[in-house]
């Protein structure tokens, strides 16, 4: 009765797909409440520099982002924000109604929005490939390898989440 379940479910799905360390409600999360309502809404997803398997603790604020709270943050398996030391998400996930809504929504998104995300990555990588030489000269990073790593990591993460959340028809 105190949260907008739809916005919170979407928030958890996005943060868990990306395994975003900053999505733990301690640093980079925005919420709002309508003046005439008692519900808290999640909004404005942002700050994904420590997500999608890219975990560089030299750039992270270990105290605020809980480096010790996120073991295995670069792997495909296990939950990130559900298992963080911030109890709100874990408490929500322990409620059957919330978890059922989450798995239903994930199942729906898996064949639509998530499939579109994977196609968008490939499409944008092809478009940006024209600038790959300039990118390498500036950053000394291999763009194609970075895209391949992202796709491999995302596919592995989705396979793991499918085992946990995907509803078989």
Which residues does each predicted region cover?
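Middle-to-C-terminal accessory/interaction subdomains
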Residues: 1-25, 29-169
């Amino acid at each position: 009765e105190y949260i907008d379940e739809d916005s919170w479910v979407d928030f958890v799905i996005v943060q868990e797909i990306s395994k975003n360390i900053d999505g733990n409600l301690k640093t980079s999360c925005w919420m709002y409440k309508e003046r005439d309502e008692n519900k808290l809404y999640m909004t404005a997803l942002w700050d994904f520099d420590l997500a999608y398997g890219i975990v560089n603790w030299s750039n992270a604020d270990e105290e605020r982002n809980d480096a010790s709270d996120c073991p295995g943050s670069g792997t495909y398996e296990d939950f990130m924000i559900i298992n963080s030391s911030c109890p709100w998400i874990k408490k929500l996930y322990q409620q059957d109604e919330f978890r059922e809504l989450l798995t239903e929504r994930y199942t729906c998104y898996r064949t639509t929005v998530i499939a579109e995300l994977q196609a968008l990555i490939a499409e944008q990588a092809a478009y940006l490939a024209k600038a790959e030489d300039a990118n390498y000269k500036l950053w000394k990073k291999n763009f194609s390898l970075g895209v391949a790593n992202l796709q491999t990591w995302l596919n592995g993460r989705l396979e793991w989440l499918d085992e946990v959340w995907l509803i078989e028809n």
